[in-house]
Amino acid sequence: MYGIEYTTVLTFLISFILLNYILKSLTRMMDFVIYRFLFVIVVLSPLLKAQNYGINLPITGSMDTAYANSTQEETFLTSTLCLYYPTEAATEINDNSWKDTLSQLFLTKGWPTGSIYFREYTDIVSFSVDPQLYCDYNVVLMKYDAALQLDMSELADLILNEWLCNPMDITLYYYQQTDEANKWISMGSSCTIKVCPLNTQTLGIGCLTTDTATFEEVATAEKLVITDVVDGVNHKLDVTTATCTIRNCKKLGPRENVAVIQVGGSDVLDITADPTTAPQTERMMRINWKKWWQVFYTVVDYVNQIIQLMSKRSRSLNSAAFYYRV
């Protein structure tokens, strides 16, 4: 009897000692794994950059909203800035190294010299025919001219907004505009646009469909024309197609990587009265200086404030691709 009890006690002690040894071994192994894992994290953490997955995904509205809690690089370290200016600016400055001077001044505002591009255009009229905005941020300087203020307004409306466009065959079809965002945009060396509104029987309203001389003329020998007619009414068009191309376009919304700076002028260009402009604020501003050096100095001084009003976009504007999307 006593032998059985001794055996039971001995078995219990051996089991307890064995279990205690196994638990201690497991504890040492876990400590080794955890400490080694923490050591690896500490060593590698300075070499890794934080990634915030999903934060920058668009929810609704603009695709260009930058959220405060996302990992963001400094704008000027990863972006390009194009500055568009008229030929008269370079002519007045008359200095072969003026661009290098401005690049060095932009550097004082945090923009590396390789990120600034200077783009010259002849005048507003020629720029309207072939606008090309390729940089992450684009600032267009437009010298005010009372004789060209309507051209300036149309150009501003074109480049400050995105448009979805399709070609129009005016020889075969009638066209109508469905809503206020629907416009007909014409570009070319000389665009003369005539329209004839039609009734439900496709007869001209105040005009003869067989006589273009009776059509209403809405533009004469212009480079850029944004035509707006009565919505929901079919129109027969007459366009100088030999020197002009017309497209059926839909305004999608603001092109947020473009800003227009008006140089001088007693009147301030304003396209926010257009009901299709939403929101009712545009990246348009005015600088009142007589000399171009003073204009460029002001742009350099306020470049970062100007950029804050804009959003970096991936799409560029190229009139050659206007048929699809600009």
Curated annotation (Swiss-Prot):
Ca(2+) 2 binds at residues 177, 228-229, 231, 301. N-glycosylated. Residues 253-255 are annotated as: GPR motif. Residues 237-239 are annotated as: LVD motif. Disulfide bonds join 82-135, 165-249, 191-244, 196-207. Keywords: Calcium, Capsid protein, Disulfide bond, Glycoprotein, Host endoplasmic reticulum, Host-virus interaction, Metal-binding, Outer capsid protein, Signal, T=13 icosahedral capsid protein, Virion. InterPro entries: VP7, VP7_1, VP7_2. Its main location: virion. Residues 165-167 are annotated as: CNP motif. Ca(2+) 1 binds at residues 95, 206, 214, 216. GO terms for molecular function: metal ion binding. Glycans are attached at residue 69. The keyword Cell membrane does not apply. It is found in: Virion; Host endoplasmic reticulum lumen. Some rotavirus strains are neuraminidase-sensitive and require sialic acid to attach to the cell surface. Some rotavirus strains are integrin-dependent. Some rotavirus strains depend on ganglioside for their entry into the host cell. Hsp70 also seems to be involved in the entry of some strains. Belongs to the rotavirus VP7 family. Calcium-binding protein that interacts with rotavirus cell receptors once the initial attachment by VP4 has been achieved. Rotavirus attachment and entry into the host cell probably involves multiple sequential contacts between the outer capsid proteins VP4 and VP7, and the cell receptors. Following entry into the host cell, low intracellular or intravesicular Ca(2+) concentration probably causes the calcium-stabilized VP7 trimers to dissociate from the virion. This step is probably necessary for the membrane-disrupting entry step and the release of VP4, which is locked onto the virion by VP7. This is Outer capsid glycoprotein VP7. It comes from Rotavirus A (isolate RVA/Human/Belgium/B4106/2000/G3P11[14]) (RV-A).
